[in-house]
């Protein structure tokens, strides 16, 4: 029933991915060996969305783990949930992509991609009614970005009518791991625009800010950041995994969230975000949740929704709460902030409610916004890209793997087109008076 095949590529993708499996295994009562140790039928009712039942009472994730070097894989395998995954589903090379998109997409990655597709095919064949794929990766490195996008386009060829969903970690403005991030990210976005149905943009810097300001962690680790990401991922998929009063699946989400096919880059948010020490001191209410999840401080992408307008948004509430109250609050927030929503899409906020809250919380909300403000993120990458590309800095690493400069130019202009499309719809709302006058003639 509506299965999802999960793929994690590259170091970042594997770290986020394995955290995600820890979180949802916990929610479904699956222990690190794959045995069910839960206490509620609800945990098993839709367990087959993400897990395969291998034998009596043993559940195996429908996950494919991909990397071009063995390092991260080894640490996943020796990590707490390493024995959960099917050993054949670890697919790795030995050479590494060295943060080079061309290696991931054209040379090293292309050699490994058929092995990966075999495993993906095997997973897809064991499903009843495949809903789609989700990929976790980063856009700044070599494997996640280069090989990740290669996998997407190959899977797209084979399963054109299935939803393709990515959780993409976008290079952040202040925190940079490698110099060539702008190149890798631009080349990746060029692919994502064409080949995915929904992309959740996650940004390390925004995550750092949340950890630092809201969660009061003085020195956040990648573990802390990944925990936030996995909370969001668990929230986005919660409707698929648990029964609820108002359910959504990946396709419903796409239909409601994507007004124009290219504009499918979402900003996730999560509430309640309270520091660990503060958690037990406050009961959270539906109005607070709604307020918090539209708050710019809770966004996981480093752009400010107040600088743009929401084309569409979705909120997924978890926990026992009154539907009536949820609807009232959602309406309330739209009325109060009506200037931040485009007026040419009426009722552009979708709500879903699921009865089962995440561990340790009475209720929570996950927010997904399709805001024109996301262009800030692409603009930033594009500026850095242009600065380097104008001088042809570092290009030899890419041309040496057989890439052409033309491809860079195309990717650059595709990204700039994307920015101006967002801008166009942001302004489409701004001059409706002129449009009304025009209609009135």
Swiss-Prot record:
Expressed primarily in touch receptor neurons. Disulfide bonds: none annotated. It is found in: Cytoplasm, Cytoskeleton. Its cofactor is Mg(2+). It holds the Pfam family Tubulin_C. The keyword Nucleotide-binding applies. One of its GO terms (molecular function) is GTPase activity. The keyword Mitochondrion does not apply. Keywords: Cytoplasm, Cytoskeleton, GTP-binding, Magnesium, Metal-binding, Microtubule, Nucleotide-binding. Mg(2+) binds at residue 69. Its main location: cytoplasm. Transmembrane segments: none annotated. GTP binds at residues 11, 69, 138, 142-144, 204, 226. GO terms for cellular component: cytoplasm; microtubule; neuron projection; neuronal cell body. InterPro entries: Beta-tubulin_BS, Beta_tubulin, Tub_FtsZ_C, Tubulin, Tubulin/FtsZ-like_C, Tubulin/FtsZ_2-layer-sand-dom, Tubulin/FtsZ_GTPase_sf, Tubulin_C. One of its GO terms (biological process) is microtubule cytoskeleton organization. Tubulin is the major constituent of microtubules, a cylinder consisting of laterally associated linear protofilaments composed of alpha- and beta-tubulin heterodimers. Microtubules grow by the addition of GTP-tubulin dimers to the microtubule end, where a stabilizing cap forms. Below the cap, tubulin dimers are in GDP-bound state, owing to GTPase activity of alpha-tubulin. Plays a role in mechanosensory transduction (touch sensitivity). Mec-7 beta-tubulin is required for the production of 15-protofilament microtubules. Dimer of alpha and beta chains. A typical microtubule is a hollow water-filled tube with an outer diameter of 25 nm and an inner diameter of 15 nM. Alpha-beta heterodimers associate head-to-tail to form protofilaments running lengthwise along the microtubule wall with the beta-tubulin subunit facing the microtubule plus end conferring a structural polarity. Microtubules usually have 13 protofilaments but different protofilament numbers can be found in some organisms and specialized cells. Belongs to the tubulin family. This is Tubulin beta-1 chain. The gene is mec-7.
């Amino acid at each position: 029933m509506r299965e999802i095949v999960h793929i994690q590529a590259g170091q970042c993708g594997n770290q986020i991915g394995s955290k995600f499996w820890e979180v949802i295994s916990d929610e479904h009562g699956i222990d690190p060996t794959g045995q069910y140790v839960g206490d509620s039928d609800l945990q098993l009712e839709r367990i087959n969305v993400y897990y395969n039942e291998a034998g009596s009472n043993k559940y195996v994730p429908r996950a494919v783990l991909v990397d071009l070097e063995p390092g991260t894989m080894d640490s996943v395998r020796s990590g707490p949930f390493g024995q959960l995954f099917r050993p054949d589903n670890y697919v790795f090379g030995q050479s590494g992509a060295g943060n080079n998109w061309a290696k991931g997409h054209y040379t090293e990655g292309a050699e490994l991609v058929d092995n990966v597709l075999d495993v993906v095919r095997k997973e897809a064949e064991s499903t009843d009614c495949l809903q789609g794929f989700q990929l976790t990766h980063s856009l700044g490195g070599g494997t996640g970005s280069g090989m990740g996008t290669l996998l997407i386009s190959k899977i797209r060829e084979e399963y054109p009518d299935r939803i393709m969903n990515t959780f993409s970690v976008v290079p952040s403005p202040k925190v940079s791991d490698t110099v060539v991030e702008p190149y890798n990210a631009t080349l990746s976005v060029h692919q994502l625009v064409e080949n995915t149905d929904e992309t959740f943009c996650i940004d390390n810097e925004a995550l750092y800010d949340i950890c630092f300001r809201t969660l009061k962690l003085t020195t956040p680790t990648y573990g802390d950041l990944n925990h936030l990401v996995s909370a969001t991922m668990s929230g986005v998929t919660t409707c698929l995994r648990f029964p609820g009063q108002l359910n959504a699946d990946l396709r419903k989400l796409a239909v409601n969230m994507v007004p124009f096919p290219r504009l499918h880059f979402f900003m996730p948010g999560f509430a309640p975000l309270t520091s660990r020490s503060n958690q037990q001191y406050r009961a959270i209410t539906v109005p607070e949740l709604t307020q918090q999840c539209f708050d710019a401080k809770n966004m996981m992408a480093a752009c400010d929704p107040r600088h743009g307008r929401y084309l569409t948004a979705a909120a997924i509430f978890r926990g026992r709460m009154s539907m009536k109250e949820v609807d009232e609050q959602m309406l309330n927030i739209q009325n109060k902030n009506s200037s931040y929503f485009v007026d040419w899409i009426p009722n552009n906020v979708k709500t879903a409610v699921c009865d089962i809250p995440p561990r340790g919380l009475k209720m929570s909300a996950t927010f997904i916004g399709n805001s024109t403000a996301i262009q800030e993120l692409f603009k930033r990458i594009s500026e850095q890209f242009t600065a380097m590309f104008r001088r042809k800095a570092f290009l030899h690493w890419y041309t040496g793997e057989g890439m052409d400069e033309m491809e860079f130019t195309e990717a650059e202009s595709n990204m700039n087109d994307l920015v101006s499309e967002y801008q166009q719809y942001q302004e489409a709302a701004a001059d409706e008076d002129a449009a009304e006058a025009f209609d009135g003639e």
